[in-house]
Amino acid sequence: MIDGAWIEGEQLQTPGPKFIEQLADLLAELHKSSYAMENLNRMWQVMDDLVEWKEKDTFCEDALYDLYAIKSKLSRGNACIHGDLWRQNILVDEEGNLNGLRDWEALSYGDPHWEFRMIRRWIGWEGLDKLLFLYNRQVDWHVHRQYVEILDRIAICHSIRIRKERGLLRHDKPNAIENFENMKRVSWPDWG
């Protein structure tokens, strides 16, 4: 499934009926491969940056607290991960079938939980559950939804932090920070 060739496709808007199964197959293959050249350990750098961030709110503090509670369980660093898996980097055809992934600059060895942190924003929690079920059947380790939920909260905090510190990214809409703030309330209704 992974061949490194140029592919046609559009950014993920609406996944097709086979998309989740196709993504599970692709990620299982990638995570068992040896394509990465280095261990960048981006997950821990994001966490360290958030710890140092002076403007973090209680949502971020709580996410960091929960992350520290599972930190020892996230030390698996020998899976080859894409590292930036979100809608803009997932290509699909007209029927919503997975065509491939793009933007491989974050390719490294790391914990597979990190890979799943943002995808639920487009496939929903039920889609994530199905993806994890299909993925976990194919690998020798287990990715836990609870850990992915914590990492998703960390990713939301990180997205807000980088935009507040550096400004909006080139692909952002003008209300990007507001959208991430809303994501906290919609995705995590028990918070604030």
Task: Kindly label every feature range from the protein language model.
Residues 10, 30-38, 71, 139, ...:
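A general structural signal marking secondary-structure boundaries and capping sites
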Residues 31, 78-80, 148:
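Structured catalytic cores of enzymes that bind and process phosphorylated ligands/cofactors
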Residues 4, 20, 34-45, 134, ...:
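Inter-domain helical "communication" segments and dimerization helices
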Residues 1-38:
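ATP-binding pocket architecture of kinase catalytic cores
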Residues 68-116:
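Active-site acidic catalytic loop and adjacent metal/ATP-binding pocket
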Residues 118-192:
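Helix-rich C-terminal or lid/interface subdomains of diverse kinases
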Residues 2, 25, 36-75, 79:
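Active-site catalytic-loop/activation-segment of kinase and kinase-like phosphoryl-transfer enzymes
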Residues 19-22, 84, 112, 149, ...:
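An acidic site on a long C-lobe helix of protein kinase domains
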